[in-house]
C-alpha cells in the first residue's frame, strides 16, 4: 500500500506498508513495487493505524447490551467500516444474567481468528444514582463481591469496568479488578479530590467520558470546591477519554484536555449508541430522541450518547479543535491500545503488528479499511477509483 504513512516515529511522505498473512511485514520509505505483490496505490492519501474503540455501546441499529451474537456482529461491523479495527463492546447497566450472556457471546466471537472484538467493557451497574444520566435506574446498585468475583473468576474476556468510586465497596472492587489486570475507570461520579486521589491509589486508573456525568468546579453555600474534573487533572498518572464528536464537548474543552493531559494520557471514544452508522430514522428506544446530531434523553434532561464513529472523532479533533493530525490519530489508536493492553499487536503501523490499516482522503474521510490484512467489505473504494 503506497502513500503518506503515519508510523510510531512520525510521517513517511512517500512510503509503503507491506502486509502478508494478516501481519505488517515492513513499513518502508520506498514505494517501489514488490515482485508478486498486489499494489494498492494510495498516493495523495494518508495511511494510518486502525482505530481502537474502547467505549461504544452499539451501532448499526443494535446495542451490545442486547447480548446476542447478531447484535454484536452488526454493531461491531458498523464501527469496523469506519476504521475501528479493534473493538471493546460496552455494556450499559444491566442485570448480571445479561452480563453473563454477553460474556458468552464475546468469548465466542473473540475466538474467531479475524474478529475485531478484543474484549468486553462494562459500564455500571455500580453507579451513583444521582449521576445516572441515561443509565437504567432500575439496575443501579453498590458493588457486591458475591456478583463480580464469580464473574471475573469465570472469564478473562472482561478487559475494562467503569463504576462510581464513591460507592461503598468501590475500593475493594478496584483492588480486585486491578489484581485481574482489568482497566478500571471512574464514571458517573460526584467524587472530589480526596476521593479521586484515594480511588487512584487502589486501582482506578482512568476517567470515562471525561467532563460528562461528572461535576467541575462548584459552590456549596458560600464556599467553592473542586469537582471531579479538576481532581482528575490534578491526579498525575490518571488517564482520560473524551467523546470527541464536537457535541458532547466543545472544541475549546477538547483542546484543553489535549494540552493538560497530553496525547499519551488521552483517548478518543465515541460512547456511541445503537444509532451510530444507523440508516433508520426512528429511535429504537422510546427513552431517546435524535436531535442536533446527537442522542438525547426524551425529556431533554441529558445527552444519552453519540452517533459518532471513530473517524468522526479524528476529523473533529483536527478540523474543529485544531489538533495536529498525527496526535488525533494516536489518541484514537496507539494510546487506547496501550492503555487497555493490546499494544503488542494493535494501534500502530509497525513490523509484526496486525495489518489493521485505514486510508483517509484529504478531508479525512475513510476510503479503505484493512482488518487483519483483509479489506473490510464496503470500504474497498480505492479498488474502484
Annotate each predicted stretch with a short phrase.
Residues 3, 280, 338, 348-385:
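C-terminal cap of metal-dependent C-N hydrolases
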Residues 57, 61, 73-102, 115-128, ...:
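Divalent metal-dependent hydrolysis catalytic cores, especially in the metallo-beta-lactamase
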Residues 77-88, 128-155, 198-239, 279-303:
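Active-site gating loops and adjacent loop-to-helix segments of metal-dependent hydrolytic enzymes
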Residues 153-278:
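Active-site core of metal-dependent hydrolases
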Residues 224-242, 258-270, 275-360:
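His/Asp/Glu-enriched, well-ordered alpha-helical/loop segment
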